[in-house]
Amino acid sequence: MDADYGIPRELSDLQKLRSHYHPELPPCLQGTTVRVELRDATTAADPSGEHTIKRFFPHTYGQPLAHFLRATAKVPDAQIITEHPAIRVGVLFCGRQSPGGHNVIWGLHDALKVHNPKNILLGFLGGSEGLFAQKTLEITDDVLATYKNQGGYDMLGRTKDQIRTTEQVNAAMAACKALKLDGLVIIGGVTSNTDAAHLAEKFAETKCLTKVVGVPVTLNGDLKNQFVEANVGFDTICKVNSQLISNVCTDALSAEKYYYFIRLMGRKASHVALECTLQSHPNMVILGEEVAASKLTIFDITQQICDAVQARAEHDKNHGVILLPEGLIESIPEVYALLQEIHGLLRQGVSADKISSQLSPWASALFEFLPHFIRKQLLLHPESDDSAQLSQIETEKLIAHLVETEMNKRLKEGTYKGKKFNAICHFFGYQARGSLPSKFDCDYAYVLGHVCYHILAAGLNGYMATITNLKNPANKWHCGASPISAMMTVKRYGRGPGKASIGVPALHPATVDLRGKSYELLSQNATKFLLDDVYRNPGPLQFDGPGADAKAVSLCVEDQDYIGRIKKLQEYLDKVRTIVKPGCSQDVLKAALSAMASVTDILSVISSPSSVSTPF
């Protein structure tokens, strides 16, 4: 099986054309001389969890933010990396494949070779399993030739498993030592980058010389925080899904007799569903975050959709398209509680056929109410991160079944006057995640690969490659590196009334912000989407010409660029230091003190634990 990794692909004409496309580097990374600026130490976004994070990451917490600048940039204290000794770097894919992953490796390889042709890049075959077993493939120009700007992870393969246990961590360390690696680059999402942080801490503690770097690559779009604006693969996934959805919308409008229920891959968060809604304008989307915030039951959701169907029928519209995120099932309070009971029994070794009889009375009643196919799917063993196997639970069929039952009831009672309700169900996920990457994902991933090299060249450990100002062209991107521990939060698990909760620092999936601009845009258009059939077809992925440079709606409407703002703040502070120094006038000093007192008072209130939202 290992012999299949890294072999040349058979490429179509379009794939060949794409393999010749070379992404543009931002000015700060062009050439062989890059300046790195390390300034103030980072801190946790949630002050209440800082003590716990420090305790878990004593060696890698509180490291400074890194900015990569042009060699000509005149910035105090920024260092030019002049020496580039030959280094050995390992790279692996962790988690589900996401379009653009290959370009991270391509960018890393190019950066390694341009700075020292003797540098070596080793790819681990089969993800973390290949890391533990020390199965490697040397990445060369020949190996990369047919994987540039291509989808999938088939150059190296991947794994879903975490690097969690002591045995696994020790195996990873043994591999890095045996292969004499100066750096280890882990490409993945929330879980994989949490693992990268723990590995980096362990390596620092044991004086292992390997530096660990994480890269934000996940189709779910849920590795988002103040440092990370977007994830490699999300742009492609949403564009491919949006075309499929809009095709279905056109079909629904043509036949005028079907309701399509479409479940979208994306794990617990609803980012993919929200973005696809903003791109294709289906009639309705049920976001998991809305359901959780309003504590909607499965019956509430059913009634909500049925009321929408009835409202459309009153406008002589007996068709529609409804999007559902795959994480919706875990957002429904009573179903989530049922899953927790089932998973607890599975962990105790109770066989699936015996679980129903051991559930609590209310859970048993809900379980028996559900259709047989859903009961069977809920009994699947949880993933390695203890979440349900969401891609295997056909939520769209469950919701369609419940809606159809209710609509037939209303039809019989005479409260619904429309045509007989007909549902067609789809699950979109696998169709998109192996797609050719969009131009944005090709560019973003390639540049992140270069950033990984500069992180290692600067001797940094426990960092994630980050780029901000992404909604603008690549020549305006801000490249840097952020300590992964600074992105962590502490999730608290209550252990009953009066019991102390336990804190586990980790990267937690970012959910859709119901106060954010993307959700606001959806809310403003929800009624129009529901009743007016303003379906929008963005068409297939474009690699050149109109549409090629289009970016995710959610990326463009949010006002981000954290690194750029940090830089701007530092410039202001530097100006203050230049103006206010011993010898300045009393008026200048008094004005500075007054302004600073006001600013610090405001910031103290905003940053207090009570005003910081904490994930629970």
From Swiss-Prot:
InterPro entries: PfpB_PPi_PFK, Phosphofructokinase_dom, PKF_sf. The keyword Oxidoreductase does not apply. GO terms for biological process: photosynthesis; response to glucose. It holds the Pfam family PFK. Pathway: Carbohydrate degradation; glycolysis; D-glyceraldehyde 3-phosphate and glycerone phosphate from D-glucose: step 3/4. GO terms for cellular component: cytoplasm. It is found in: Cytoplasm. Keywords: Allosteric enzyme, Cytoplasm, Glycolysis, Kinase, Magnesium, Metal-binding, Transferase. The keyword Cytoplasm applies. GO terms for molecular function: 6-phosphofructokinase activity; ATP binding; diphosphate-fructose-6-phosphate 1-phosphotransferase activity; metal ion binding. Allosterically activated by fructose 2,6-bisphosphate. Its main location: cytoplasm. Tetramer of two alpha (regulatory) and two beta (catalytic) chains. Belongs to the phosphofructokinase type A (PFKA) family. PPi-dependent PFK group II subfamily. Clade 'Long' sub-subfamily. Regulatory subunit of pyrophosphate--fructose 6-phosphate 1-phosphotransferase. This is Pyrophosphate--fructose 6-phosphate 1-phosphotransferase subunit alpha.
